[in-house]
Structure formats: structure tokens, C-alpha cells
Amino acid sequence: MLAAAALLPFGAASAQTVDAAQRIAEAATRFLSSLDDGQRQKVLIAFESDNRLDWHYIPRNRPGLSLGEMRANQAEAARALFASVLNQRGLELLDGVRLLEGVLREQQGSFRDPGRYYVSLFGTPGRFPWGWRFEGHHLSLNVALPVAGRISVTPFFVGAHPATVRDGPNRGFRLLGTSEDLARQIMAGLNDWQRQAALIANRSFGEIVASPQRERDLGEPRGLLLAGLDGAQRNLVEALMDRFLGTLAPDLVAAQKRRALEQGISAFRFAWAGSLTPGEAHYFRVHGPVTVIEHDNTQNGANHIHAVWRDLTADFGRDALADHYRRQPHR
């Protein structure tokens, strides 16, 4: 069974998460140690800064230190920081986003730059609360360790433009293609009433709903309830969820599986909007009580994907922080 939320509790089996928190802090400290004073000043931002919550996936100026500004050893230390949270598939997802930025650079010019992906650290590594972000065009990974025993990894956004590379040395590359294929398998395997329950709109939405500052627009979960699926159908939905949730380091995934059992995966719903014809605009999502995974492919002739994993209570470690401040008011 897959994870249902991004907030990772210690609980009785907390040793793995304790190790993860220490590993992440050590990787962040090593990264900081590789920087000179000027670079360190660019990277370090107060945890309380509004910027920590100001995530986005459009090409824009960002705080932090870009990969393009780093020396080779610094870029290696940054990658080790990413690897403290992500597994190999997760790292390949980051690489794929930047590869596609290179494809766009060839088509559109230097405005597109695989080096313009920025690392920011919020607070002091190992001293709660603290966290970090890796962000650029079509990528936003937000890691927060708000209190001892909590790790949040959302919002986690990945985009793919082009969704399918149509020419050049990377022709045929589909960064998020497996997600679309799984979603189409799910829809193809439904009977008529299940398909009608899953279809929430005849046209795609044109964008993810839970974009920055808009997560409330999602409302209550809609679509086909997973409790009504048979085992094979549910396995496909879980495999679809795993395209995001399964990108984390093994110990973090293990903690998420415990969380999933608490939340109950049967309460999730699968929804589709738009055309079922390959190559045409479509949207789908898996939405539970607090967790949502969205995928929209509408722009540029349905060759431009926006996908996101949100935890609607634990993004940025918010619920852990709120609980902490209730218990220990800060003046």
C-alpha cells in the first residue's frame, strides 16, 4: 500500500526517520561547507521568511544559489543533498526536468537555462525548524523539518515540456509518460458506470488546480472512490501514485506507508477530465482526505505537462509547526 501523505511521523518505528533527519542535516551542512561566504549568504534564508512559502514553477528570478553558479564540487554536494531525500528515480526526475530545459533552450534561446535551478536553505541545518528548496522552471521540491520527528517533502512539482520530445537526440523521451500510461490503463479498465463516476469534466482544466496559493479551489475529493475498485484496478491507481511517492529515499517511503495505513487509501478518489484520445488535452488526479496528485496536459497541443503532489495539511510542515506553536507559544 502506498503513502497517503507527505508528513512523516516518528511513531513507534521511528528509527528510520530519525536517521533520515540526521542524514538530510549532514548533507545540508556539507553543502554549506563547500560554499564561500558570498555564496553562503545567497543560500541561507530565515525559516520564518515569507519566501519559504513562495513556491512556483514558472521561469522567474529566484533567491538562492543556482547550479550554474556552482563549482563542480559544490554541485556534487548539492546533488548529495537531493539524494538525502530522493532515490535514484527521484534524482532522474530532477535530471529529466533540466534535460527538457535544454531542449527548450535549443528551440527558444538562452532564456531557457538548465543552470537556472536554485538551492535555498531555510534556517540552520539540524536546528529545528529548518528546511531547503530546489526550484526552477517546471520544478519545485520543498523539504521541511519543522520539529523533531517530522519531515515534509511537499509541495513537489514536476513539469515536462515537451511532454514527448519529437526530434533531436532525445526524440521519444517522455519524462512523465508512465504516469499518463497508467492513468489511461485505469480508465480503459473501468466499466461504464465507473468511467462516468471518474469523469468529472468533458474538457481538461488547462492547469493543475492546486497551483500556488490555490489549493483551496480543489474542494472535496471528486471522482471514482477507490473502495469501489477491484484489486487489479486499485493496484494501477497505487502504481500511479507511486510515480511521485516512490521517488523518495527508502526510509522515507517506509514512513509514508505507515502513514497511509492510518489515513486509509480506500477514501481516495480517481478523477479524469478532458479527452480520452491520446494526443488530446486531458487532466487526471488522485485525491484523498489530505493528499492530492494532479497531472494536466493541455498546453502546446497537449504536449506540456504540469504535475504536482500536495499534502493539503502538511505542505511546508505547516500542521507540525501549528501543533508545536500551540504547545509552546512563541513570543
Task: Please tell me what each predicted stretch does.
Residues M1-L2:
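N-terminal export leaders
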Residues G11-A15:
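Sec/Tat signal peptide C-region and signal peptidase I cleavage site
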Residues Q16-N87, L91-R331:
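A cross-kingdom marker for long, charged
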